[in-house]
Structure formats: C-alpha cells, structure tokens
C-alpha cells in the first residue's frame, strides 16, 4: 500500500462481511448479485485462504475481472477446509509463475538453506551456527522454557542490543504445557514486566494483563485494531 497508494484489506472486509450467519456460514454483502467494482483483485498470502472464503471471493468478482494470487504453497495450509493454492497450482489450469530468488535474507543465510532442506524433506544441518539461525537442544520442556526466558531477558539483549518487548517474538506450536503460549507468556511477564503496585492490572480468565505488557490482537475489530497488530498495554 505504501508504494501503490491503494488500500489493502482482508478478504472479509473486501467482501463486506455481515457478522450474522446463514446456515452456519458467514454472509457477505458482496456476491454475484452485488459484485466488486474492480478490474483486478490481488490476493496475498493465498495459502491461508480456505475453500469457502475463496468460493465467496470468486462469486463476488464481476465478469472480466482479473484475479492475481500471490502465495507460497509450501507454507501451512489454511485453518479452514481445503488446500486451495496447492490445488490450483497442481491443476495446470491457470498460469503460474514460480519465484525462486529469496530477497528477505541473503542466499547463504542458514534460515534459507534450512528452510529449503525441510521443504525437500531433508534434515537441516543443526551443527552449523550462524548469526541468523541457532539450534539449541534441551532434554526437557522445563529446560526449554528456562532457555527461552534466558534468551529473551538476557542473552539476546546483551549480544545484539535487542529490546525484549519490541525486537523479540517467541512462537510456540501449542497453547498448553510447559512450552505452550500460556506458560511462556506467564513466565516472560514475570521476568520482563513483574508486578508493581504502580502498574494497572486487569485479570482476564486465568491470566493477568498488566500495564507495559506486550499484547497481540488475535480477533478482528475493525473499529479498533486489526488481527496480528501488537503493542504495549
């Protein structure tokens, strides 16, 4: 949007989602009877689009409109049903352009070479250490948790000058357990933003939101913030 000067929005917002449901499905104001007024629509991160949302988008395109889809079929498929991008590419029905050069990291970056190995079904070389990729092996979940906390609170800030809140993001594949997001957030909050009578707190379920916490919005509210916006509360 910075280069084109045009707005970008989610498919739900583009199709003018109606927050009521019909037969258990989300309703959109844009459809075959009320199509989008555009000659071309570009969809980024197409691997995240499930078959139901894609069907709604196709119905809302007017005759003669062009649909340009951008995405990586090797990323995780959508949470909802279908593997739309992969199926479209494999169909040999639509024109496909494969981009092979990585610009986000250097070609020799261990992040890049390790990712390519995993996509090819091979084990990445975990013995090599580089500035952008490190593998730390631990024997228990508790040891992993303590290592993550130590990396965020001490080692990465000391080695690279990172701010634990602004420059570091921890990702976990689970919510529960010693290495799940719930316990990671609790432990990191305890170390990085401890309880202080001068800070406002708000209890929410089993956890506590504290002034100065890093938070992430995970459900869209178009009047306030967008999904994946994060900041300090």
What positions do the PLM features span?
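ASCE P-loop NTPase helicase motor core
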Residues: 1-129
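Conserved helicase motor core of P-loop NTPases
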Residues: 73-232
């Amino acid at each position: 949007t910075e280069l084109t000067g045009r707005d970008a929005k989610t498919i739900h917002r583009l199709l003018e989602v109606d927050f009521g449901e019909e037969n258990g499905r989300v309703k959109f104001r844009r459809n075959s009877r009320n199509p989008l007024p555009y000659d071309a629509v570009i969809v980024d991160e197409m691997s995240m689009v499930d078959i139901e949302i894609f069907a709604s988008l196709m119905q809302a395109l007017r005759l003669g409109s062009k649909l340009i889809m951008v995405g990586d079929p090797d990323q995780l498929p959508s949470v909802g049903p279908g593997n739309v991008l992969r199926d479209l590419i494999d169909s040999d029905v639509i024109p496909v352009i494969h981009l092979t050069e990585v610009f986000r990291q250097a070609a020799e970056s261990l992040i890049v070479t390790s990712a390519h190995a995993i996509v090819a079904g091979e084990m990445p070389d975990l013995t090599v250490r580089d500035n952008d990729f490190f593998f730390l092996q631990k024997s228990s979940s508790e040891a992993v948790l303590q290592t993550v906390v130590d990396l965020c609170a001490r080692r990465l800030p000391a080695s690279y000058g990172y701010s634990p809140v602004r420059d570091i993001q921890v990702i976990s594949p689970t919510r529960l357990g010693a290495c799940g997001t719930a316990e990671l957030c609790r432990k990191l909050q305890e170390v990085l933003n401890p309880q202080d009578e001068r800070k406002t707190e708000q209890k929410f379920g089993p956890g506590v939101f504290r002034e100065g916490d890093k938070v992430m919005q995970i459900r869209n509210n178009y009047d306030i913030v967008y999904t994946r916006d994060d900041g300090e509360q």
